[in-house]
Amino acid sequence: MKYTDVFVEMVHGVGILFAGHFTCEGLIDDLVYQDLHERIDRTRFSDPLEDSGFQYGFNSTYLKKVVSYWRNTFDWKQQVAVLNKYPHFKTKIEGLDVHFIHVRPKHRGDQRVLPLMMVHGWPGSFYEFYKILPLLTQNHDGVSFEVVIPSIPGYGFSEAPHKKGFNSLAAARIFLTLMERLGFSQFYLQGGDWGSLITTNMAQMRPDRVKGLHLNMCMSTRGFKVLLSMMIGPYLPFLVGFSREDVRRLFPFFEKNVWEMLKESGYLHIQATKPDTAGRGLNDSPVGLAAYLLEKFSTWTHKRNRDLEDGGLERKFSLDDLLTNVMIYWTTGSIISSMRFYKENLGSNPNDRIDARTGIFVPTGLAAFPQELLHCPRSWAQIRYRNIVSYTFMPQGGHFPALEEPRLLAADVIQFAKKVEEL
């Protein structure tokens, strides 16, 4: 990264001291790029099984195409220019350099500007939100958003924690401090994957400051009510608060939930137990890293992509976008520290944590995308989220909606905020 001098940014009349505004030109290092190409050139490919698609993981035949594009066509300098499209900042919080993007609407006029923090997850990064940013910062019938997008410590340009125990509660505490430094007394939150847990924790910690919480991933809680609805739901859905769409997405339950999770959660067990072991190989091999990360962008976008030779990757994403995300992990060497976040949150029983036993009372909006890893009906979400003002069955999309379906996600965030603002 290339830093300017230390400076004070005026935000809402408040002077905020930062370590510096920076650009990403420092990522364009000829020696680093030469090293990347040398490592790519030394890749040892293996042959996939016949007609295996992505059922065994990233298909090696298609991987050769991706790697060839990466080596011969992908223009990292051009993508760094794209990264620099929005202003980047760093500030030190609790001893860690925390990276974030801060984008204000271009034309304020008479419009109401609502502060919004959006938080990514794994294997994503701040770059996930680049397509949705211009949609949220434009005027929507008098409403627009001033957007803050931080990188979770240990991801991308944020410094990695140096001590054990940095979990979602710690990240939530740091991001609350960030919004306070930026001068926002109240604000909206949006998140998916780890971002949904972090923003939920923020709403639990400071409900007085969180005007609204919007999630595109919601994990259900356990208990008798959930168990009973699983038993009765397929036959008498109205008795347990299920809609027809809930039934379609949930059942048969074992096939769509238990079996699917068994097929797709192997990575989770590794990262929640021994992240440094697997991460060591990924941090050393760019092609291994790309295969590991991009396989998730295939399967988590649509489960049927497992049956395709190319994993359906280019149906929703461009190789430039996918490889830019990979390069953020590669150039910052952050794959191991990002994987550790699983162990910090799942290394012990998450149901024993205080946040698992604490309700969420701020206005909440849920966008239920049909290809999300697990479907959470409104009746299940209400067990924890006590003030759901918006629940939308999204027509299409999976785990990465800001990158897959930015218009759909933006529209739902906007309508949710308008409901909360009573516009």
Describe each region flagged by the PLM.
Residues I270-L423:
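C-terminal subdomain of alpha/beta-hydrolase-fold enzymes, centered on the catalytic histidine
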Residues R112-G121:
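Short beta-strand element of the alpha/beta-hydrolase
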Residues W76-Q78, Y127, I152-F166, T200, ...:
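Glycine-rich "HGGG/HGxG" loop immediately N-terminal to the catalytic nucleophile
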Residues G20-H21, E25, L31-Q34, I40, ...:
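Alpha/beta-hydrolase
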Residues W122-P134:
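The serine-hydrolase catalytic nucleophile loop
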Residues Y33-K106, Q111, W330-D352:
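Non-catalytic accessory segments flanking enzyme active sites
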Residues E94, V148, I152-G192, S220:
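Active-site loop/oxyanion-hole signature of alpha/beta-hydrolase fold enzymes
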Residues L135-S144, L182-G241:
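Conserved hydrolase catalytic core segment
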